[in-house]
């Protein structure tokens, strides 16, 4: 009762052949087995929030495993292998009834998929999705702000938006800028293919501008500005952080302190940069 445990059930993906022996369809049987496995590994009786990691059906965002596809492949529009949303919801209802999960949510969903799940749950008398976890940070704002903010307002669905990658996989710490310490460690150096959406795009150039803003407003570092900005969005209920050590964890927690404010002037400058770099991770250099 002292912590909230959240985990996910992954869906089909060509680059996750090792997961559940390659059978990652979000069928009822697979979802139930995945939750039992999570309960065993977590050594707990229940999960507070179970999330469906990404859609089982075809959507452009996850077709190639890197969440940055921008073209809609019409040949994949009819996906005969996708599990109906009704079947996925049936599995979630079973888990709720069994007491193995307290709430359920979505992740990397589309506005249509989120609303469809919400309506199906209402029709079936099942608890509606509590949350939808989405990619959101200074470099990636458009899909959330244009497609989900209105959908998730309290008077509409009331689904909580959880932001993941608030530091853009570490890019928004500033440690990968060329004038920073070249010996710095990080996943993007140790695993060059990790989060390739931030490599080979205009993201690095945008980061330089955000770094300069952070310094001009006397922020301790770019990380503090990036995290604090996400946390102060009125439509973001919480954010998912990641830390490799206690120093990074302390830095992340410190950013939740209200002493690191976002003034109206700073907000305007950030929005001006967003106008300049509206979707940098989708534009190749």
UniProtKB/Swiss-Prot annotation:
UniProt entry keywords in alphabetical sequence: NADP, Oxidoreductase
An MF annotation (GO) of this entry: oxidoreductase activity
InterPro entries documented for this protein: AKR, AKR_Detox_Biosynth, NADP_OxRdtase_dom, NADP_OxRdtase_dom_sf
Amino-acid positions noted as binding NADP(+) in the UniProt annotation, renumbered to this chain: 165-175
Keyword flag Oxidoreductase: yes
Record-stated family: Belongs to the aldo/keto reductase family. Aldo/keto reductase 2 subfamily.
PANTHER family linked to this entry: NAD(P)-LINKED OXIDOREDUCTASE SUPERFAMILY PROTEIN, NADH-SPECIFIC METHYLGLYOXAL REDUCTASE-RELATED
Protein name: Aldo-keto reductase
Species of origin: Babesia bovis
Organism lineage string: Eukaryota, Sar, Alveolata, Apicomplexa, Aconoidasida
